[in-house]
Amino acid sequence: MKHKILIGSLIVTLFAFILYTSNIKRVENAQLKIVEPNNSKVAKNKKKTKGPKVKKLEKPKEPKVNSIEYSNHVKAQKGSNQKLVKQIKKVMGIDDSFQVVAQDLTNSSHFAVVSNTNKAHDAGKTMRLFLLIALYEQEQKGKMGSRTAIKISKKDKAKGDKMFQVGITYGVSYLRSAMLKGNKTAASALTRKIGVNNIDQVAKKMGATQTKVNSNMTGQTTANDLAKTMIGLYQGRVLNRQYASRVLATLAKERPSLVSGLSGGIYAIGDDDFAVAIVQTNGRAYCMSVWSTQH
């Protein structure tokens, strides 16, 4: 519980800082009105600017240390906003291994990718983000729909699960809702229907190159991969706008406690060690992805 509070506190703190620095930058770039005795002029920056593009998140290089990953070997991706980097280091401290990605989705230059390890780590419920995207990709291709039903097999049934019965058929929507609430039987049935390889392929198409999905919907991923995936949804990668909106709407309903301190339009998923979210507020959007574990 203490660890979940730490990650939740980190997300709230960093989002507040991102909003603060974004507002400061916006004020600095604003047009300045010069008041003179008889007239007024507006000083404009004549340099043409292109529309914002989200900067491609690169894979940070692994610190050159021995077999142990030392928490003080913190690396920031080239181009990272130094104010954000400083704040991330301050919040994370030196006692944990961590990966943090923060990206302003309306300003490509305002981002930070900071970590002391770039390895993929075990994830729980967060891995279901990839299953959710794969489900909607199947619908987008016409291979599944609202009338699709799946019969629960003995292999699907999780020990102690009283929600689903072997041999009974359930609709995809019902299974999807149960899966997102943590039901292992539903996750197994949906994974079997789609196929682990197809889910892995969807992850790769979203840019999650270090992610590996297991048959029981656990697996390994990174904060960077999760950020790429959420940003991909926001940009309409793999899923068109209609189906990407459905995924985000689903994530808005299943808001984890880790982001309970945030306000605005929030699309998030998380577990004990990972959390990823997109927050829309005041006409802007931000993505935050975090992995942290206590030694």
How does the language model describe each region?
Residues 1-26:
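Sec-dependent N-terminal signal peptides of Gram-positive bacterial secreted proteins and lipoproteins
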Residues 33-47:
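Short extracytoplasmic/periplasmic juxtamembrane "stem" segments immediately C-terminal to an N-terminal membrane anchor
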Residues 92, 253-295:
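Short, Gly/Ser/Thr-enriched beta-strand-loop segments that form substrate-interacting elements
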Residues 140-172:
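Active-site-proximal loop and beta-strand segments within enzyme catalytic domains
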Residues 65-84, 165-239:
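Active-site-adjacent helix/loop patches that line small-molecule binding or acyl-intermediate pockets
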Residues 45-119:
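Beta-lactamase-like hydrolase cores
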Residues 219-268:
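A conserved catalytic-loop motif detector
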Residues 121-150:
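Active-site SXXK
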